[in-house]
């Protein structure tokens, strides 16, 4: 039984082209349902791909093109709050932020903005180990 993610969850990886994001995206895809990792986001690498996964310039573009409903974030601390807000503003159902070391003030601003928007996005993290539904999905 899945609660947050399952075999139909479609995932965007923000920071997929970095060392950590690439490693963990490959590991998650190897675990189960590789085709459910549908996009990466990196504004400087938009229009390219990694392991056959298209890279988009924004989360909104990735969501519109792929039907993604979740994002996992492997962006360095200085850019992580902006990455979270981009995913929230794209109205994804779930955002999992793996990044650690995000300044507390940045996260207070993120939570405040989520309240202002009346966001329905569930944010797990930051500094989160991810989540798993056995044999269905690992983020």
Question: What residue spans do the PLM features occupy?
Answer:
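Rossmann-fold NAD(P)-binding glycine/threonine-rich loop
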Residues: 100-124
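General beta-strand structural signal in soluble alpha/beta enzymes
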Residues: 13, 39-42, 95-97, 122-127, ...
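Glycine-rich phosphate-binding loops of nucleotide-dependent enzymes
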Residues: 17, 51-52, 60-63, 67
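Glycine-rich adenosine-cofactor-binding loop
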Residues: 9-24
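NAD(P)-binding Rossmann-fold cofactor-contacting core
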Residues: 27-50, 126
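A short, basic/flexible loop-to-alpha-helix module at the beginning of a structural domain
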Residues: 1-8, 60, 134-139
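Generic hydrophobic/aromatic pocket-lining and core-packing "Φ" positions
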Residues: 25, 59, 84-88
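Rossmann-fold NAD(P) dinucleotide-binding segment
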Residues: 64-70, 74, 78-101
């Amino acid at each position: 039984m899945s609660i947050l993610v399952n075999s139909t969850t479609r995932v965007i990886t923000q920071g997929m082209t970095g060392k950590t994001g690439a490693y963990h995206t490959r590991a998650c895809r190897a675990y189960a349902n590789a085709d459910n990792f549908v996009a990466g986001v990196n504004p400087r690498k938009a229009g390219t791909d990694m392991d056959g996964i298209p890279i988009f310039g924004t989360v909104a573009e990735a969501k519109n093109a792929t039907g993604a409903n979740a994002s996992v974030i492997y962006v360095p601390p200085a850019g992580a709050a902006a990455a979270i807000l981009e995913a929230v503003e794209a109205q994804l159902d779930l955002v999992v932020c793996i990044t650690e070391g995000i300044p507390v003030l940045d996260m207070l601003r993120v939570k405040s903005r989520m309240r202002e928007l009346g966001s329905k996005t569930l944010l797990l993290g930051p500094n989160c180990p991810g989540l798993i539904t056995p044999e269905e999905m690992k983020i």
